[in-house]
Amino acid sequence: TTESHMEQLILKHFTEEDFRRVWMRKIGGGVIGGKACGLLVARKLIELNMPEYAGHVEPHNSFFIGTDVFYRYLVYNRCAELKARHRLEKEHFKETEELTKRLRGGSLPEDIREELSDMLDHYGTTPIIVRSSSIMEDGYGNAFSGKYESIFCMNQGTKEERMEELEEAIRRVYASTMNEQAIEYRRKRHLLDVDEQMALL
């Protein structure tokens, strides 16, 4: 995380084993974002402070796709320069439209696709949800509730069909950083100058 309050909670309560478990489930570099950190911290606080309820919490079975994958996706699909100009020009509509188009039509680097394929092997044909977990999301004072997409994947059919469904879900979540609600929320919170980075949960 890059959020100081969240960082303090994590450093105070997490063990070396907790960090290792996240690392084992992480795809790509960078941080895992606000929503993922919030989820992990909430689970840890229940475990430490309300052990009588810990047994009722479902076992953690999520993977984390780091913010560096989003950055690489931008570069790989010729979006990085456009995104930088878009931010400098205070999220101008023309750049928003073009950037959304490129994000929705992009492709992932092959090494990331290989790791995603391994992740699908882990889940088998169990349905999954690709959830946004941006740097700003669910941080102190900036909830971003419902501003970015979460995509349900049936995860059925051939391996190729399941991979395509997963990649399309990732593209949609990445593109949701450009939706009108998210931009307006950033504008109201005076966050247009902040480089929003998207991790996935």
Predicted segments, located by residue:
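Nucleotide/phosphate-binding sheet-loop regions of phosphoryl- and nucleotidyl-transfer enzymes
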Residues: T1-L201
